[in-house]
Amino acid sequence: MTTNKDVECLVEPTSNISITEENKNVTSETTTTTNNTQNKETETTDNINKEETADKENKEEQQQEENPENLIKHPLQNRWSLWYDYQSGKINPEHWVDSLKKVISFDSVEDFWCVFNNLPNVSNLKQGSSYHLFKDDIEPKWEHESNKRGGKWFVMVKDKSRCDNQWLQSVMACVGETFDSSDEICGIVYNSRKNGDKISVWTKTAQDEKATRDVGNCLKKILEIDQTIQYTPHEDFIRSSKGSKNLYEC
């Protein structure tokens, strides 16, 4: 390989050329060194900025976690439990509870939304399926102590495109205690059936006509319907599997 010294020997009469070559090499090395230094400085600055951003985000997250307001949940007046059942064929009144399963319970606004934001919509329920949302100490059974002297308002779902919103609105009215005579409310049920879906609100005291009618009228407002709805007592179902007569209408 030809070195700078070799160049000097070969071109002694015109030594200025060798000086120029050396200057070029020095300039090139200086430029390369300068660029490397600038790149390192830029890389260092970027790393510092990233670390500062990460530290800031970590501090903000820590402050949010330490903020007591972020840890406070808004309690509901009652604790509620969600149940599910599926009937593959004709419902046998004596054995239908065998498929009834308790899914989850909640007692705060935050937990309510956590449950319902992850719950399949009623419009997607398989035919034969039902959701039951009841106060935690009440099982969704006719013969339960809180239900056996009561009954239910039931509404046939005529517009399937509205069923998800109607179900959600009626559920929120239950857990939010916005029904008139809300103390009478035991729970609410959504049935997906071949012959038509149905929303039912269960109450405690069938013979309390005023309180029962208050619930029925409020349900119609919540669902935004003008159709006539019926109320049937559980007592008739308990006595006979043939069903019961409507006690009230509104």
From Swiss-Prot:
The keyword Oxidoreductase does not apply. Gene3D superfamilies: RNA Cap, Translation Initiation Factor Eif4e (3.30.760.10). GO terms for molecular function: RNA 7-methylguanosine cap binding; translation initiation factor activity. InterPro entries: TIF_eIF4e-like, TIF_eIF_4E. It holds the Pfam family IF4E. Keywords: Initiation factor, Protein biosynthesis, RNA-binding, Translation regulation. It comes from the Eukaryota. Belongs to the eukaryotic initiation factor 4E family. eIF4F is a multi-subunit complex, the composition of which varies with external and internal environmental conditions. It is composed of at least eif4a, eif4e and eif4g. This is Eukaryotic translation initiation factor 4E.
